[in-house]
From Swiss-Prot:
InterPro entries: Znf_LIM. SMART domains: LIM (SM00132). The gene is CSRP2. Highly expressed in the aorta, but not in heart and skeletal muscle. This is Cysteine and glycine-rich protein 2. Transmembrane segments: none annotated. It comes from Homo sapiens. Residues 10-61, 119-170 form the LIM zinc-binding domain. It comes from the Eukaryota. Its main location: nucleus.
Length: 193
């Protein structure tokens, strides 16, 4: 802990980690949102983390990268090599050259993944204390609202279309079925004599 207050520095992004969002591993501190596998970016915990040269991995990625290799050491069909079709004239995708970062943050993790995730609505950084996951994406608590009416949403009350989130009512009005027989209940029926 630093002498003059504040908190420990995150082992991934290098920023200050406060107690409410701290995860400790191998004598280092991490933000909960930074405690991710270096390869697949899955969230980690004390039962799924594996460490190699101060980098953190899930056990699956660690095994693939640093585990024993050779006949008899496969981990099921997921480790089989795939024919890429070169003999059929299919060209493999070109690999992009590595570009050095201009980010002053020297953390390998932050350089590789750009630090904090971005909010799907406003595009600003989302930190663990204010992050909500909805439709598989990060959102600020204040941005986690219906795109049409602005009503605050919960993960159980949202519907998603083309990357935007809506309350069930607005989704039904704007994207639901239309035409005869799709009124709003018995009040939409008209009886003519």
């Amino acid at each position: 802990m630093p002498v003059w207050g504040g908190g420990n520095k995150c082992g991934a992004c290098g920023r200050t980690v406060y107690h409410a969002e701290e995860v400790q591993c191998d004598g280092r501190s991490f933000h909960r949102c930074c405690f991710l596998c270096m390869v697949c970016r899955k969230n980690l915990d004390s039962t799924t983390v594996a460490i190699h040269d101060e980098e953190i991995y899930c056990k699956s990625c660690y095994g693939k990268k640093y585990g024993p290799k050779g006949y008899g050491y496969g981990q099921g069909a997921g480790t089989l090599n795939m024919d890429r079709g070169e003999r059929l004239g299919i060209k493999p995708e070109s690999v992009q050259p590595h570009r050095p970062t201009t980010n002053p943050n020297t953390s390998k993790f932050a350089q590789k993944y750009g630090g904090a995730e971005k909010c799907s609505r406003c595009g600003d950084s989302v930190y663990a204390a204010e992050k909500i996951i909805g439709a598989g994406k990060p959102w600020h608590k204040n941005c986690f609202r219906c795109a049409k009416c602005g009503k605050s949403l919960e993960s159980t009350t949202l519907t998603e279309k083309e990357g935007e989130i809506y309350c069930k009512g607005c989704y039904a009005k704007n994207f639901g079925p239309k035409g005869f027989g799709y009124g709003q209940g018995a009040g939409a029926l008209v009886h003519a004599q």
